[in-house]
Amino acid sequence: ERRDESGRTGSAGTVGMAIGAADVAGAPSASRLIPPLATTAIVLVAAKLLAHVAANVWTPYEFHRDAFLYMAMGTHLRILHMDFPPLMALISEAVRGIAGASLFAYRMIPAVAGTAVLLLAVLIARALGGGKRAQVLTALAVLVNPLFLRSANLFQPVVLDQLWWLLGCYALARLDDSGDAKWWLLLGVAGGVGLLAKFSILFFGLAVLVALLLTRHRREFLGPWPWLAIGIALVLGSPSVIGQVTLGFPVVEQMASLSERQLARVGFGEFVTDQILWQPVGFLLAVLGATTLLVHPALRRHRLLGWVAIASFGIFVLLRGKSYYYGPMHPLLFAAGAVALERITRRRLRAALTWGAAAGIVAWGVLAIPFGLPVVPPEPMARFSSAIGITSAVRTNWGEYLPLPQDYADMTGWREQAEAVARVYRSLPPAEQAEAVLYGRNYGEAGALDFYGRELGLPPVVSLAGSFYLFGPGERSGRVIIFLGVEPQEISAITCQSLELADRVTNPWGVPEERDVPIVVCREPDMTLQEFWNQVGHGYWG
């Protein structure tokens, strides 16, 4: 006999997985002892943070349209009266107050959160009994995956959603391994803070519930700990719940609109294909991980996690969820797959599969890095996207195809729009400037005007789109309204004494609605903005 790299013994001639007798019997064993944290894995965690710092310094792109919305929500912060979970707005105001409103400062938040995602993936591999090889392979699979690279560059709740899902998985892994009830408390914290970030944490909660009912853990409901975890989650996430109650559950309208305009186009084939394309070798590792969690005797105490992964996959398929919704489960499955490879007892086979998986993961990751880190300028990025030929990488939520990935297209042209509006505003007589109000057709345009307007000296910004409707019409009556993104013939809800097409802003790299954007000046409308607000109502995706 000999001892392998992870500290287990096995016969050199044995084919398959190294499973100790104590593991099969469920008795305490060496595998229950948490292996040491691999130094190389920690180096990879640090490398991820450094990569995002570098990308944030040298990026040729602006803020994403969604970031403008969350920054505006922070400016109009009303924690218990918000249509979206308030955590991003709170973070936005904290960043603005501590570090200033710079692109680098805001993007360091997802960079740190994304680094924490990678660290949690390593810790999960360790909790599953993974030694150095398993931890490093898990770290590689997450590090170069374009899904996790991109989410860690965008000031959005996506990376926070990934973080809290994974923290919940880590709590379940430790609960399975130790039986210590305190891990229920961490699960509750993950659910509660996750509810402050994104409502999709509810799908994780549903998947956990299904998994608990399908495993031996169903008996836990006879005790206090699961209920205490639920209570903690509800208390911590209560601002999100209270906001929905006070506003009449706008999330229902949001989801209905999202389903009609975007999710209806998501089919099973597309959903699965995207899981593969993010990391083809990683996908095989994830499939191995799911299988290992469900059927491998040595990991049978972690079967709960396997059912969480299966249940969440089924939920998103049934609800036609976007492909990235399942992203938080990938690190868990990478970890389980890496542990499975590490447990192969034939040394040469184990080495060949592990090194082969690592090489395949890194090779695809290097090729896909431009789709994860926004460092390549638009024109060469468009050429690269065309040369690669992966159409799903440049497909929008509406099924259209762009020269750039949609997230990249949504990071172009905003400052040009604000500067064009500023020129139109400054061309007005002083009396009209004193009365002027800016109107953005969608939350990206309104948010960009609101953000850059402070620097450019622009008047207040209003919009009926998304959360901006809740911010209200402001105090000015709107005797002069400068519309951004609205054609003159589309202004029908009010009648203007004069209507002037003052300018147009073109952006060949933007999404279709931002490529040729009109700027229209409306003078002496037949109603005040306050009357207009009460009459028209809002639209979340307008």
Model-found features: residue ranges?
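Transmembrane-helix signature of polytopic, membrane-embedded enzymes
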Residues: 2, 20, 39-42, 121-144, ...
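Transmembrane-lumen/periplasm boundary regions of multi-pass, lipid-linked membrane glycan transferases
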Residues: 202-302, 316, 370-374, 385-388, ...
